[in-house]
Regions:
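Conserved SAM-binding loop of SAM-dependent methyltransferases across substrates and taxa
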Residues: 29-40
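A short glycine-rich, Lys/Arg-flanked "PGG" loop and its adjoining helix->strand segment in the class I
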Residues: 104-122
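Conserved class I S-adenosyl-L-methionine
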Residues: 124-147
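Catalytic activation segment of kinase domains across protein kinase-like and atypical kinase folds
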Residues: 153-154, 384-451
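Short alpha-helix
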Residues: 158-182
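ATP-binding glycine-rich loop module of kinase domains
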Residues: 269-308
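Conserved structural core of kinase catalytic domains
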Residues: 320-386
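C-lobe/activation-segment region of protein kinase-like
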Residues: 420-499
Length: 500
């Protein structure tokens, strides 16, 4: 937990110029210190624990812009003479009673910190939501390990407190009418893979990752993904998000970034993050950025892919969102509409499985027409990515293949149909049926409510044999290994790491 690179996701997306002076309060073992050192001109850490300070210093011994001050915050704070562009409280604010000896420690904590901010500076605060849905669903309170302790208002414990959105808002107001932009890390702020905001809340069906309980035994009292959808439909998600990330300042100047999705549980050569941004005029756009220097080529290659695929797909009426190279990443057109996945789910929930099948197969046939123009032949590049699979000589393919044509990446609009993600496009033959296999597999298997469709034999109806299913499952495993390289994603260690 202390050393996972995923910890850095909580703030690595925040735009820095490289000239910032940053104060990190409660830096611990340096979970986010490295990210700050990469982005800022100067980083000062305050940490009470000698052992944790030494670990942090050793981890970041090559950073010449880092200073670690060891001691009690109230004492160290009195010696600070500088003003800071950012002051971070990542998993620290809940310990306010231990940091500040007063009648209103949490309010006073923010008041004291605010004195050290530059006029346009920001406090970056990450904390669990006392009313987070995971606690209702059977997760224990993070700090005390007991069920419902936070939900009931901490009746049997003291020293640590988390807050609801309403409670946190009241603290900000009392601390000097501080302004905050609210973000919602998912599954939580500790190991976030997606960050939502008030300007871009989750969409129905997006919150379906549940393997996130790494520290203690939990109960499973209900299906969280279904309850999330219900909360979203009733505009209640912000009150029940598992965690909050607040950008706090004396003035509310919104960051352009309103959504971040990390794809960095991969080989560094493929490690990226995707952002939705909104400029001052309200216009939205998408950015895809490398999270490592080694993944720049992978990201910038998207611009060329978009031009080549655009011509390729146009024959079947499929468009691609415009992509242009911008600085170290690419900028993509922001498109609005409903995904094919969402439309299929609506039909499923309405019990219209025949209409669902008809719609799904209209796209399966469309993709088949695009990708079966040539006879398949195996290349060294194919073997490198997918393994030496025993592909039938009668398989059809195309010279260029986007294997990620899953329903979630097909956007239905009034003006037409667009493919919104084509990151995994290869310029060598891949069996058309493998692309169709992935279309079906990632729709049926990514949400439990779709299990009822498995008896409809979608694979067989798509012309995929039992033998092919075995081959394509092995190809998919090999592709995942290729994408991950030597990296082992935390999710794959869940059964070994989590106590249940």
């Amino acid at each position: 937990y202390h050393f996972s690179h995923i910890r850095e996701n909580i703030l690595s997306w925040i735009p820095f110029t490289g000239e910032e002076n940053v104060l990190e309060i409660g830096s611990g073992c340096g979970a986010v210190t490295g990210a700050l050192c990469k982005k800022a001109k100067k980083v000062t850490c305050i940490e009470l624990s000698r052992k944790r300070s030494q670990i942090n210093a050793w981890r970041h011994r090559d950073c010449d812009n880092l200073k670690i001050l060891m001691g009690n915050f109230q004492e160290v704070e009195k010696t600070l003479t500088e003003k800071y562009d950012y002051i971070t409280l990542i998993g620290v604010f809940e310990y306010g009673e231990a940091y500040i000896q007063s009648e209103t420690p949490y309010v006073d904590f923010l008041k004291i910190i605010s004195r050290h901010l530059k006029p346009d500076g920001k406090i970056v605060l990450a904390i669990e939501n006392r009313l987070g849905l995971k606690y209702w669903a059977g997760c224990t309170e993070d700090h005390f390990g007991t069920l419902f302790e936070g939900l009931e208002g901490y009746p049997t414990t003291s020293g640590v407190k988390t807050f609801s959105r309403k409670e946190m808002s009241a603290i900000l107001k009392e601390a000097g009418d501080l302004k905050a932009s609210w973000y919602y890390p998912f599954p939580d702020y500790k190991l976030p893979m997606t960050i939502y905001s008030d300007r871009r809340l989750p969409l129905k069906g997006e919150l379906n990752r549940l393997e996130t309980n790494y520290d203690r035994l939990r109960l499973q009292l209900f299906q969280e993904s279904a309850v999330y959808d219900s909360l979203l439909a009733n505009d209640m998600y912000p009150d029940f998000a598992n965690s909050f990330l607040l950008l706090i300042g004396k003035e509310k100047k919104e960051a352009e970034t309103i959504y971040v999705k990390f794809s960095n549980e991969r080989d560094p050569a493929f490690s990226v993050r995707t952002e939705i941004c909104e400029n001052s005029s309200g216009r939205r756009y998408v950015r895809k950025l490398p999270t490592e220097k080694t993944s720049e080529e992978h990201v910038k290659n998207l611009e060329k892919i978009s031009r080549e695929l655009g011509t390729f797909y146009g024959r079947e009426g499929l468009e691609l969102n415009t992509c242009t190279v911008e600085n170290d990443g690419v900028r993509l057109e922001y498109l609005q509409g409903e995904t094919l996945e969402g439309r299929l789910d609506e039909l499923l929930e309405a019990g219209k499985t025949e209409e669902l099948e008809k719609l799904f197969f209209s796209y399966i046939k469309k993709i088949r027409r695009i990708h079966e123009g040539e006879m398949f032949f195996k290349t060294p590049e194919f073997v490198q990515v997918f393994g030496d699979a025993e592909i039938s000589e009668s398989c059809r393919c195309s010279g260029m293949s986007n294997i990620d044509l899953v329903p979630a990446n097909i956007l239905l609009q009034d003006s037409g149909v667009s493919v919104i993600d084509y990151e995994w496009t290869f310029r060598f033959p891949i069996p058309c049926n493998f692309i169709l296999y992935r279309m079906i597999h990632y729709y049926l298997e990514s949400d439990g409510k779709r299990a009822v469709l498995r008896d409809l034999d979608f694979y067989k109806k798509a012309g995929i044999s039992e033998k092919e299913l075995e081959i394509y499952a092995e190809m998919e495993r090999n592709f995942q290994k290729y994408m991950e390289g030597g990296h082992v994603p935390l999710r794959e260690m869940y059964d070994e790491v989590s106590p249940g």
